[in-house]
Amino acid sequence: MSRILKRIAAGVVIAGVAALLLAAGGYAAGARVNTTKSIPVGLYWTSSAPVEKGAYVLFCPPQLGVFDDAKERGYIGAGFCQGGYGYMMKRVLAAKDDAVAVADDGVRVNGELLPLSAPIKADKAGRPLPRYQSNSYTLGNSEVLLMSDVSATSFDGRYFGPINRSQIKTVIRPVITW
């Protein structure tokens, strides 16, 4: 190998190691990147803010069949949560004492139809999607409904229903989104 190629290879290795260290340091400091359509794509920072309506959150899905199927079908990734699920990012759109109803036209919270919330009957491969069944359910103290308000095709609460607050790992705040 020529001297120039050795220098180029060394430079590439050094740049790669530096990029990995920078990414690991950013993650340890609280940086999170969203590449899904469930919330705006971009860079987020973890926060100690309370979980409340309107907040973006990072959560581990509970070990339920609906999430096993979602992982198997590729709706959610593999990761380090129980059940081998990856973290998910959504927005809290309903919390304690909110009445939630799911119908063909979408999800209603306290009677108001959420935008982009109509359940889809089948995925792109033609497989039937699950659907949370509720004509009206009032969320308890420890329950939240996590949804997308920017995508009509997000795998969210319209399919899996409310989750327990204990599944939420942190609130995340947008830094740069596009």
Curated annotation (Swiss-Prot):
Single GO MF annotation: serine-type endopeptidase activity
GO-annotated cellular components: periplasmic space
Secretion signal, residue range per the UniProt entry: 1-30
Compartment list: Periplasm
GO biological process: signal peptide processing
SUPFAM superfamilies: LexA/Signal peptidase
Keywords linked to the UniProt accession: Conjugation, Periplasm, Plasmid, Signal
Pfam families given in the database record: Peptidase_S26 (PF10502)
Residue runs in coiled coils: none
Listed NCBIfam families: PRK13884.1, TraF_Ti
Function of the molecule: Required for donor-specific phage sensitivity. May be involved in pilus assembly.
Protein family membership: Belongs to the peptidase S26C family.
Protein name, per record: Plasmid transfer protein TraF
Source organism phylogeny: Bacteria, Pseudomonadati, Pseudomonadota, Gammaproteobacteria, Enterobacterales
Gene (name only): traF
